Amino acid sequence: MSPTDGSARRDFEKALDIGRPPNIARLFPNSKALIVSGKVIDRAMIAKGGAIAIAANGRNHLVIRGALLAAHRANSPIIIEIAKSEGGANAYCAVNYWNIARQVDALCNELGITVPVAVHADHYGIKSTKDVEAAKVEIPTMFDAGITSIAVDASHLPDDENLLASIALHPLIPPWAGYETEVGEIKGSQGISTVEEALFLIQGLNAHDIFPDWIALNNGTTHGIQDSEAGIQVELTAEIHEALTRYEVSGAQHGTSGNDSDRLRRIAAETRTTKANVATALQMITWGVEVNEYGNARLDENGRFVKRSDQGVTDELWEEMVAYAVEKGWKSGDYKKLNLPFENKLLSQPREIRERMTEGVASFVYSLITEVFNAGNAAPLATEAILEAGSYDLGPKGSRIEDPADWTEERIRGRASSIERDRGPAGDFED
């Protein structure tokens, strides 16, 4: 929906003038795309109440295209994101941290998208001291390339190392940018996050004048294709969010694909979640793989994906993709690795095929926005947040409550040693 009336048009033009962060204004000086900080999206969802913004993982160009069209039709702000495993230095997608903002900006201008869009670096994983040092070089380059929000994910580390890594890297993040932190690596029903460790992370950050916009938890979901009906633990999520109330941090829901609509509606209504990541389902839809209401790809009796001939890529290209995966010895969960070698082949499909790939994503995301996450018609609230602030920088929601003297490195390590934590099984749980 375009801001066609005079007042809405003036608000949009003013937001374009003052609401685009410095990196975006520098990269795209003549753009009509309203690319904003992740903070803007969070504040719009808070203002609407019981609403969650879609964070669409753009594993291919047509996912980004479809998600932006859906947001525009729903008049909803949206987050377009890519994770380190998907789009970092050693990625399995052609879309990456350094080109995603350029794709978003180009598509917004091409398609006439007039809703606010944040560009988020999801799951910037930190697994070692070596990763911290590499991040000190890499993170600034991502903001140079147009990222406007980031999730620093050191949840793979012990609680004290997670906190200390987050503190060490925070000076690299522009103060205007959206910021997400994470506790409890996403592992499904094992290694579930607790109130104690969530408080430890948020209190420690608070003592160092770091005020996250979002916290992600392991609240029962997994990345990729779900193989159980367990899913999100709504009550646990609400309990943790309630414990964090005074720190004014919203929730970020990971592993959304594979959870039924009623459970997702409860997350919107009963918790403080304002961001929900959707990745695997959108990838599958562009390919034409049949997806159920949960966003799970359907498998036949032989464990193979069910491809619909009237959706996604041509049957000929799908057969080529399957043959490539078989040659590599990939199981169903590895099919995500097809994104990089097949991106150009996706883009070289006939126009009518590309359009149905895009429209499949647009239809799915539109339904999530309007029928599940209560985020329809929230775009004016995002614009309003910019105009009220008079700036691209909305500032933090929280303020310092904790005493820094209680959160020195020595005391952080001492506190962490008393936390009882089930880390769950070892292994690679990234997607």
Predicted stretch roles:
Residues 2-26, 324-431:
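C-terminal extensions of enzymes
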Residues 57-58, 120-127, 185, 250-259:
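Glycine-rich beta-to-alpha transition loops that act as phosphate-gripper elements at the mouths
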Residues 2-96:
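N-terminal capping/small domains of soluble enzymes
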Residues 39-46, 61-86, 95-102, 106-114, ...:
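Alpha/beta enzyme core
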Residues 304-336:
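Low-complexity, serine/threonine/proline-enriched polar segments
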Residues 160-174, 225-226, 286-307, 358-369, ...:
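C-terminal helical cap(s) of enzyme catalytic domains, especially alpha/beta-barrels
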Residues 87-88, 157-158, 282-287:
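Short gly/pro/ser/thr-enriched loop/turn and capping motifs at secondary-structure boundaries
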Residues 204-314:
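Catalytic alpha/beta core domains of metabolic enzymes, predominantly
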